[in-house]
A protein has these predicted regions:
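Residues that flank catalytic or metal-binding motifs in active/ligand-binding sites
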Residues: 130, 143, 245-249
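Conserved beta-strand-loop-beta-strand element in the redox core of flavoprotein oxidoreductases
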Residues: 138-162
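Glycine-rich, N-terminal phosphate-binding loop of Rossmann-like dinucleotide-binding domains
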Residues: 39, 151, 172
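Conserved N-terminal/central alpha/beta ligand/cofactor-binding core
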Residues: 49, 55-56, 61-140, 186, ...
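N-terminal Rossmann-fold NAD(P) dinucleotide-binding loop
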Residues: 43
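Flavin (FAD/FMN)-binding glycine-rich loop and adjacent Rossmann-like elements that form
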Residues: 25, 155-167, 171-291
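Beta1/beta-strand and adjacent pyrophosphate-binding region of the FAD-binding site
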Residues: 27-40
Length: 291
């Protein structure tokens, strides 16, 4: 049975009530005012804020890193007008600036972002559980009473922990806590017709496109040779239509033209240059040069 809850932007806050017993009697139990699931930037800042307000807080992270995309390589911030950034977000960028002896800094490598995020954790003396992944949520009367966590490195009953809290906040990217709690969700992108909107579903972007004239065929100019790796022969769907697809995942890396900071690239095992042929052709078409 699913329970519908009203979502808030970025995360959903679910209030708990009296504990309902779950799991065996030997399962360790942690009890706090606020449990935050997901050590993303939102999760760290939510935990920091709650702790500074005098609440007992537990921050749960399924992996071993805090900060999400901010510390994972997304070092160029899409801010538009920087004066729109206030509060603790602004404090984060100003602390990044301290590293460079500047007032504020909007671009940064993962190492500096990680150190800055860990500073928030240290300043608030946050209790962080790493490698803990949700397996179940105990819900009564549409309220979360407790959640059960397993060790993501060794998922078995011997590693289970139960967390009781007055308030739960899902700050994960995937929304696993919400899903376990029975909140309805949609995988993919909704079409415009779902909510009578205009910017959902398939969109014909004018930005971030390949330059005109990049040949798609394995042998340039020869359709019979097949398509380059990564190109799908599917027909583009109608503008505004929905689907069940999700965004691709990728790894980010930092490059520099500072010789002192450069490190050599090592050729990975099973490297296949054919997977990057489209990139090479796009670079040539844009007349870019890499020294």
């Amino acid at each position: 049975m699913k329970y519908k809850l009203f979502p808030l932007i970025l995360c959903i806050t679910l209030f708990s009530c009296q504990l309902q017993k779950k799991g065996n009697a030997s399962t360790p139990i942690k009890e706090v005012d606020i449990c935050i699931y997901g050590g993303t930037s939102a999760g760290v800042i939510a935990a920091y804020s709650a702790k500074k307000m005098g609440k007992s807080v537990l921050l749960v992270e399924p992996g071993k890193y805090l900060g999400g995309m901010t510390t994972g390589g997304l070092g160029a911030t899409d801010i538009g007008n920087k004066y729109a950034v206030t509060g603790l977000a602004r404090l984060f960028y100003r602390r990044i600036g301290e590293h460079y002896n500047k007032f504020e800094q909007w671009t940064f490598p993962p190492s500096v972002a990680t150190a800055t995020m860990n500073r928030f954790v240290k300043d608030a003396d946050l209790d962080v559980l790493y490698y803990r992944r949700i397996t179940d949520a105990q819900v009564q009367n549409k309220r979360i009473e407790s959640i059960t966590l397993e060790d993501s490195r060794q998922p078995d009953e011997e590693t289970l922990i139960q967390v009781k809290a007055k308030q739960f906040i899902d700050c994960s990217y995937e929304g696993d806590l919400m899903a376990k709690a029975g909140v309805s969700y949609f995988v993919g992108r909704e079409g415009n017709e779902e909510q009578d909107e205009t910017l959902n579903g398939v969109q014909m972007s004018f930005w971030h496109q390949f330059p005109d004239g990049v040949d798609p065929y394995l042998k340039e100019g020869d359709p019979n040779s097949g398509l380059c790796w990564g190109i799908q022969p599917n027909t583009l769907k109608e503008r505004g239509s929905g689907d069940k697809l999700v965004q691709a995942y990728n790894f980010r890396l930092c490059l520099t033209d500072n010789k002192e900071n450069q490190r050599p690239f090592e050729k990975p095992e099973n490297y296949d240059p054919a997977k990057y042929e489209l990139l090479a052709r796009a670079i040539r078409k844009m007349d870019l040069h890499i020294d």
